[in-house]
Structures are given as structure tokens and as C-alpha cells.
Amino acid sequence: MNWLRPSTLIDAFAPSEGPPPDSLYAFFLWSLRGAFPVMWVAGLLSALVGTLEVISAFVLGRIIDTALASGPEAFFSEHLGLIVFAGLFFVLIRPLTFGLSAAANGVAVQPNVNPLVLSRLHRWTMGQAVTFFDNDFAGRIAQKQMQTSRAVTDVVSEIINVVFFALASLIGAAIMLTAIDARIAAALTLWLFIYLALIRFFMPRIRVMSKARASARAMVTGQVVDTITNIKTVKLFAHHEHEDRAALKAMGTFRERAVDFGVMAATFRVALMTVAGALPVVLIGGTLLLWGEGIASAGDIAAAGAISIRIAQMTGWVSFTLMQIYANVGEVEDGMRTLSPPHTLRDDPEAGTLPAGSGHVAFDDVTFSYGRGAGGIANVSLTLEPGEKVALIGASGAGKSTLVSLLLRLYDTEGGAIRVGGHDVRDITQESLRRQIGMVTQETAMFNRSARENILYGRPGASEAAMIAAAEKAEAHSFILGLKDFMGREAYDAHLGERGVRLSGGQRQRIALARAILKDAPILVLDEATSALDSEVEAQIQLALERVMEGKTVLAIAHRLSTIAHMDRIVVLDGGRIVEEGNHRKLLAQGGLYARYWSKQSGGFIGLNDAAE
């Protein structure tokens, strides 16, 4: 019974098989797969509406001929059937068909095609490796998703509304004019060839300019979003003018591309109106000549006139629509370049699922340099037994975060292997791997959602009691109860702002700790987990962390050595290699790099420039 609910005829969030193709036609097929049956019905209804436009002129011509031949009295008495048919046609059949066509496109197709395409692009983009996002503006990527889905939707809607309608109208007009005289139909055909030649000349140029305009628009969005995202940094460095210049430069480029597009579009419309204006002259003039020869009737003149004026009017509409279609196709191509690249970090088709509770971690002769051939880490071998607490220390750039990123399989190793629970991370799915790892980082990631949603991100199905218990363990419960956002939402319902901007650094880290506590993964990664906390709160969090770490395999990165002195083992990295390894007492006794770091600290923090001598 879905036909009684046209808005449900297309599954607006159905996934598409495989990656987005890199050819335009195949990309449209990929984007719209599953929607074609409904789109065809909408197109055929639009074609029926176009046919009815021609029939309207035909009915008008027949009424005029019949009225002139019969006279006033006989016309109403002898041709009542024609009058009733004309009334039903114009009052009932034509409006009803128009309504069905509008509903098919406006209710069944448009509202569903946009989310269908957008959801497919969004899913594909989320599967990209972190390098994809590292190399582009976040705002630009989002703009490309929105732009491409909107452009595909507009192309579909315009083809249904205009192209199907126009083709049916032209075919019907040719048939009707042929019935009057083949020479009139031939004149229409000749005009149509001239019109198509005009289209063929202008449309590719409009498409190229639209692509350039779309690219420039996305750069403006990326620049503006980048500035707004980092607005505190802009203000702290008093760089309003610098950011303004950068934005105006991007806007200036967009303006230039928009002007180029506008000039081409205006030229096209002038040429178009010239060609369109010639059609009524040719068709009406030709029919008048035939009428003078006794071949055409007065009704034929009226029908030809109505058809020619309608087609001339439709020409502007169709041409503007075709210009929009080509412009949208250009925007789709521009979006494809950004969004369609294949995933560089893929699960093996035969990848398995990492069993729950896999706490054993092994780095086996791992090398990784971010594709640069130097830097990163080299030949690192490190084993973490289940339940063991291991700290990584070293100067900035020593390779600590690289090891963590490789463990999470945000990148693939360039040499060696990483195993979790005895499984090579390349042989298990990325999702199952990351479900077994909890993480708290120095730069805590917060969503602009409620405090509840941010904590439940660790385990979405957790109960309210479990969520609150996690917040209490992270020393976050008390400050959350005092939260209130600008919409009046309070406590756990209060939204935290973009990237948690309404919270202090310490509050954000406590939310992140609560999230990790709730996740309760067998492996816990702490990347400067308490760096943004004051001493009193840090002491409280350290106690909570010790409880959370019980029974878990822990890999902790720290510059403040006092926070990791109690770890089972401390691994010192320098220049991407392990240079020392042991517990706190052993490393101090060795008098090496760790001892030198420790001696430089008073409550301890490793400087940016500290390194092995």
C-alpha cells in the first residue's frame, strides 16, 4: 500500500553497493540506485502533462472549427458532447494529471533523493582514512557533500519536470502540425535543429564554468569555517585582518568565477530568446499561408498559434533548466573529485572480528614514516602482556603518538606488524579492533551534543545509572549538574558547544575519561589524559584511573613523569626508536635519558626540545 503514501516509495537511506565510480554516468547510477522505478513513474506523468498541453491546443482548434461551421444555435444543440468533453478535460482531467505529476516529483522523488545521495556520500566519506581529512578543510568536505547531493537532486527533478515534459510536448506538437500540413511540421523540425545547435554550443561551456564556480565556492566555505572553528586563536593573536584578507581573497576568486558564469549565461539567454521569438512567426505565418490556399482552417491557425506560443515560452524555461542541469552536472563533477577517491585504508574482504577481551598487544619490528621515507618510527618491537601498564615517554616527535595511531590502525605500517590478541590488525576489521580500545587524549573531542550523548558515545546502549556512575568515577558528575546551555537545557541535557567550547580543558578531559570508563574496553590508551587538570583534580583523577586500569592493558603517553612513575614498565623513545626500557627505579639507576628527564623536572614535564645527546 506504499502507493497511498508516496513519500515512502523510495528508501531514503538505503546503502549503495561498492565505492562511488569516477565516471559521471556511473556516479549517477550509484547515487540513485533503488530510486529509478519511482523516478520513471514521475517522468512518465510529466510526459503525460506535456502531451495534455498539445491536446489542449487540439481541443481548442476543434471547438473553433466546429463553432464556425455550425453557427451559435446549432453548436450548442448539436455538439453538446464536445462541449462536455472540453469542460471535463480542462476542469478535471488536466488539473488532476498536473497534481499527480507534482506529487510524484515533489513528494515521492525530491524529498527522498537528496538524503539518499547525501547518506551514501556521508557513509563513504566516513570510511576514509584520517589522512583524507588531514589534507583538506573540514568545511570544504562538508560543503562538497551538501553541494553534490543537492546538485544530483536538482538534475533529477529538472529532468522529470522539464525534459520529459518538453520532449512529450514537442513530439505531440510535431504530430499535430503534421496533421495540418507536413511543411509546418518540417518548419518546426528545422527550428528544433537550430535550437539544439545553440544548446550544444553553450552547454559544455556553462558546465565547465559551473565546475570552476563550485570549486571556488567550496574554498570560501572551507576558509570561513576554518576561521570560525579557530576563532579563539584568531582573537588571541589579533589576526582579524589576516583572516579577513584570506577570506576576501577566496571570495574574490569566487566572485570572478561567478561573473564568468553569469556572462556566459546572459549571452546564452539572449541568443535563446532570439531563436525562440522566430518560432511563432514561422508557424503562425506558415499556417496563415496554408489557410489562404484553403488547406488549413481557422481552428488550425488557432491550434498552431497556441502551440507555437507555448513552445516559444517553454523554450526559455527549458533552456534555463538545461543551463541549470549542466551547471549542476558541473557541481557534481567537482564534488566527485573530492569525495570519490577510493579508501586507502580498507578492511580485507576476509577480515575477521577481534574477540572480546583481547588484551595482548605486540609491535613486531614496526616501521612507519608517513610515506616520507624518514622520521616516524623505525624497527620498534614492543610487547604488552594482558593487564600490563606500560608508559611511553620521549621528546615531541619521538614517535609516541605514531605508535598509538598504528595500534588503532589509523594508518597501516610500512614495515613489520602489530598484533592484538595474537591477530594481525590488518586481518581484523577496523571497527572490531577499535571497540576493544578505550582512549583519552590530550585534545579531547567533544560533539556539540548533550553531556549525556557525549558520555554515552563510549557505550550507546548503557543505562542512565551506568552513565552517571562513569561520570562520578571521572569526577565529572558534580560540574555536569551545574551546566546550562543557551537553550535552557540543564545538567546532562545541556549541550557542550562545538568541540566542547563551553567547557574548560579540565572539564572536557573529565567527560572524555567518563566516556572511556563507560566503554570498559580491555585495552586503554591514555595520551596526556590528565594534562589539562589542576593538581587537586589530577590527584582525584589519578585515583579514578588506577581503579579503571585494574585488569586492563594500558599504554600511556606522558610528558609529566610523575603521572607514570608507578607504571609496570616505562619505554623511552628517541628519534623513532626504543632507547631505554624498564621500571622507574631501574631507569633512574641506569642514569640514561629517562634519568636526565627526571632530573630536569620538578613535578615533571618533558620539554619540546629534550632529546638524547
For the regions a language model picked out, list residue spans one by one.
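Transmembrane helices of ABC transporter permease
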Residues: 34, 38-48, 93, 161-212, ...
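Alpha-helical segments in transporter systems
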Residues: 37-58, 83, 87, 105-106, ...
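Membrane-integrated ABC transporters
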Residues: 1-53, 68-86, 101-109, 123, ...
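ABC-type nucleotide-binding domain
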Residues: 354-613
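Juxtamembrane loop-to-helix connectors within ABC transporter transmembrane domains
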Residues: 35, 101-102, 106, 110, ...
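Cytosolic ends of transmembrane helices, especially the final helix of ABC transmembrane type-1 domains
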Residues: 239, 263, 311-338
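Helix-loop junctions and hydrophobic alpha-helical segments within the transmembrane domains
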Residues: 121, 125, 234, 335, ...
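An intracellular "coupling" helix at the cytosolic face of ABC transporter transmembrane type-1 domains
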Residues: 33-34, 130-131, 147-156, 160, ...
